[in-house]
Curated annotation (Swiss-Prot):
Name of the encoding gene: Casd1
Positions in the Cytoplasmic compartment: 1-18, 335-363, 417-439, 483-486, 535-546, 621-638, 693-698, 747-770
PTM section of the record: N-glycosylated.
Organism: Mus musculus (Mouse)
Alphabetic keyword roster: Acyltransferase, Glycoprotein, Golgi apparatus, Membrane, Transferase, Transmembrane, Transmembrane helix
Enzyme nomenclature, EC number: 2.3.1.45
Name of this chain's protein: N-acetylneuraminate (7)9-O-acetyltransferase
Expression by tissue: Ubiquitously expressed.
Glycosylation sites: N46, N175, N187
Amino acid sequence: MAALAYNLGKREINHYFSVRSAKVLALVAVLLLAACHLASRRYRGNDSCEYLLSSGRFLGEKVWQPHSCMMHKYKISEAKTCLVDKHIAFIGDSRIRQLFYSFVKIINPQFKEEGNKHENIPFEDKAASVKVDFLWHPEVNGSMKQCIKVWTEDSVLKPHVIVAGAATWSIKIHNGSEEALAQYKMNITSIAPLLEKLAKTSDVYWVLQDPVYEDLLSENRKMITNEKIDAYNEAAVSILNSSTRTSKSNVKMFSVSKLIAQETIMESLDGLHLPESSRETSAMILMNVYCNKVVKPVDGSCCQPRPPLTLIQKLAACFFTLSIIGYFIFYVIHRNAHRKNKPCTDLESGEEKKNIINTPVSSLEILLQSFCKLGLIMAYFYMCDRANLFMKENKFYTHSSFFIPIIYILVLGVFYNENTKETKVLNREQTDEWKGWMQLVILIYHISGASTFLPVYMHIRVLVAAYLFQTGYGHFSYFWIKGDFGIHRVCQVLFRLNFLVVVLCIVMDRPYQFYYFVPLVTVWFMVIYVTLALWPQITQKKANGNFFWYLGLLLKLGLLLLCIWFLAYSQGAFEKIFSLWPLSKCFELEGSVYEWWFRWRLDRYVVFHGVLFAFIYLALQRRQILSEGKGEPLFSNKISNFLLFVSVVSFLTYSIWASSCKNKAECNELHPSVSVVQIVAFILIRNIPGYARSIYSSFFAWFGKISLELFICQYHIWLAADTRGILVLIPGNPTLNIIVSTFIFVCVAHEISQITTDLAQVVIPKDNPSLFRRLACTIAFFGGVLILSSIQDKSRL
């Protein structure tokens, strides 16, 4: 009864809401969100530096999130690279001195806070040619004015960056009097033109005063109240912002420290000075403001302009624009032709006569329609991760942000279960289900930033290995059973795997190796194909006639294993192979193939394990040792129970080991050899009981059919900044933002999967002469792209 109600309910839902309806809704949502963000940027401004300097919130303890953009955490080498031959000056009171110390410690963590506090403090890194000075001027007075005036008159002494601020001493010395505030306004007014003049050629920041924790203030500081601080800040802002009447002031207000202090001042030791973690955050913000445009970190979107379009991107834009125009012209012509062929009414009988000519969908129409849709989708990709239209945020990991969504999807997956069409081991529905739930877990892992939690990282590594295991299992099974080593099959698989990634490499200006998983499965597919296609070609049909063919296949697999082992422990040989042009253009990342070697080596044996498992399974199946009937256990009851017990123990043992990992490098070294234990254990647990083989989760299987597209699309339209951050379509509401962005992301992935399938039917013909002509055109196309890419790379140097 429950099953009947479920099926009726599902039909009712599908009647009113289909995948097509979902995609239309997603398109409307994208257009509305794009319009809202565009209007917001027109109204509030498009400068993310202003947001970085003025707004933000804490994601968690000590993790600051600027409004609308991502903040990069600078390493020592990056800071020195940015500040080479630069002079930075901090001028002000003890709070500015604290900021100076935190800034210098980014460059040199060993720098100590020592010496007389009420005097100038110099810092110089001669090797990096970086000079940072603190100048003790606790009040805005004639002394500070004279110092600033010298900089305006002497270009040699003038710093590249000036960070200034003072007020608490004026409040303290004059006991918070109104006369002191009036004098402060006069002094600020007198130095404002000088700061504005400096700001034309240098970066000038005025640091607004942070609030105090009045309960902790000593008796001689009790007059420094938050009310007084607000009055002094208001005076500084109004005067400095009005120092130029013709345009916006070039002196930047560093007001974000106030927000940071509001959350952390309770941790202060004296109620006046901020704790070290807060100072470090403010110093890192300063570093981002000045250095992001120089270093251009991927995970630092604040203060970075939109990257200029490359020649290849411009050509791609022209191609997609022409495709869209071409499709609309084709559509108008086709519609007019359809109107002419409308059913007409017979004058005698009054009945409609239907046109018996049914025009088939042409290859040209499929091509134009597919590229039209793909062009619009790529425009969305570009808007999300290149055009700075939508906002981005940093990831922040908590256990709840990872495990609660996992529980949600598991409940949904269990709820949507159906009977399988067949009950064989790793049948199609089951492998789709396996891919689906693994992909959903990996997506949650990426968006939650769970890679920082080692036990989760190690289990996710097994899921990635399981994908590669399926690659070995699936491709070996196909070639072994069907013996189809034709070029058509190879082209189909390569097109299915690589089409989206190649388009993204062109549109998003990213190297092929950036989407590391696709090169990985592509290379392993070719390795399996070459291993089995080379003479002698051994298939199941041939091996059944002579047992020695089995030995021949095992010899081939043994040689493959030997090659894998050699390349895994010979980094030099591996890098020489993949550093050859044009392979280097495909497998290099930032001028090195090390990343490719690391990725390949991390799961080097699991594809071989998949091939070996498929060989053993098919051999057992051929000899009818397995019982794969509906509801039947895979083996006899005793053997099945024993294998189930061993599998459960092995599965849990691996999880306990992975959860107890302390060192990522050591665990990664063991992972290639031991990941197969949990994979095979899972397969046996899932397939030995007959009832488990007979059902599958249609929810997970649906996602499994588009798992490749989900994995690739997440880089730019769900995550952001090339997976380093999170895309923000709806600011201020993280839960609603995730729901909306996920909905659009899944719809896009599904549509791209359909586009790839449609194009594969047209682009890859079954007759060899046509196929070879297409291959020649493809080679010429990639040759042109590689040449243009090489020219672009040289122009960037």
